Amino acid sequence: METPAPMVIRCGTLLDGLGRSERNAAVSMAGGRITDVRPWAEVSRQPGIRVVDAGRLTVLPGLFDCHDHLAAPPRSLLERSGTPPSLHVLRVAETMRGMLQTGFTTVRDAGGLDLGLKLAVEEGLLAGPRVLISLAIITQTAGLADATNAVGFSTEVLRLPGAPDGVCDGVDQARLMTRRLIRAGADFIKIATTGGVSSRVSGVLTREFSLDEVQAVVAEARAFGRPVAAHAYGGEGLKNALRAGVSSVEHLGPLDDEDIEMMVRQGTYLVPTLLNLQVRLEMAQEPGALPAYSMEKAEELAPLQQAAFTRAHRAGVRIAAGTDSRGLRPGGNARELSLLVKYGMSPMEAIRAATSTAAGCCHLADTGSIEPGKRADLIAVDGDPLDEIDVLADATRIALVVRAGRTFRNTIGGEAGGQG
């Protein structure tokens, strides 16, 4: 792809992703990187440099979704089983386009997406968010992501055909599976150490894998420089994940003092995926939308999340935004930020959770904030998310989307004038 042309964005309000707010700033970029941030009054017009006037808008870093399953949109097993793979891939690509159009410039896919769509974005064939992939969820037999039912029929709806099956048992198989996923292109490793809301066999807090198995996965991933994300709602499975040294904990269930102390001490990221339960509870109004066992678990777990979130937040656990939303309507992923605020974060904290803190969770040190040297991932929104966080979930109010210095959405029109 050609190198992005230089550009300057005039900002009504600039939120840098690190907790700072500045009025009437200007952000300059070239070669896909931010080169300068200064007051608009100090900017001099340079020939050949495009200027975008977002002087009435709020500019902030591109948003992250640290936990999604882009290959598993909310369609029934029956419908998915009758869908040609090529059509399914095109639907996934459309979901990715929609996410970028609504301000999400980076997504960490926690199982299902294959290497092809990631490369399509990198090569410019698909206008989607930057993607980090785990390919599959490492799971034990009869565990969270074992899609084989009691009669041997696969109910797999998560993975694209190019993503491996992550079922394995024992230390040696766990180590081998980690290596296979890395060989297949995984940016990070995802392991399930407890059951989940969608588990057919296990409960939400059922321990999955032994400590030795989890340690084998983490050690092997570290040898290849890959972080490990653990699906872990609580109990002994969560403790095993933390003892093994995972980089992040996905989802949120009951937390005790030991869990929180380990997360704070080790710097473990928590990706609570509050929206996942919210969406499931909303789907309860649609007959047959979800299995009864899944709805029962969601209803039991939902009231526990508020207390757990409050304790983790107050203790200083690093919380990153992720939805586990599986292809919501455009703008829907940003509802996670509204829930973070509802559960106790300030709007600025929620924005950091979806920008700079999320970048840390994704191990992308050169993204997530608006500073010289960082990747030029920015969005502009019509409104003030510090006053009304829900504005980020309104697709019609996302006026500008820039990823790596390239403009993928611009409803502003016109250039800024009045430069010195």
Identify the meaning behind each predicted range.
Residues 1-8, 14-60, 414:
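Histidine-rich, glycine-flanked metal-binding segment
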Residues 71-90, 94-100, 141-163, 197-211, ...:
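Active-site gating loops and adjacent loop-to-helix segments of metal-dependent hydrolytic enzymes
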Residues 74-77, 145, 199-200, 238-244, ...:
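Histidine/acidic-residue-rich catalytic or RNA/ligand-binding cores of hydrolases
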Residues 83, 223, 288-293, 299-384:
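His/Asp/Glu-enriched, well-ordered alpha-helical/loop segment
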Residues 91-117, 128-137, 163, 186-199, ...:
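Divalent metal-dependent hydrolysis catalytic cores, especially in the metallo-beta-lactamase
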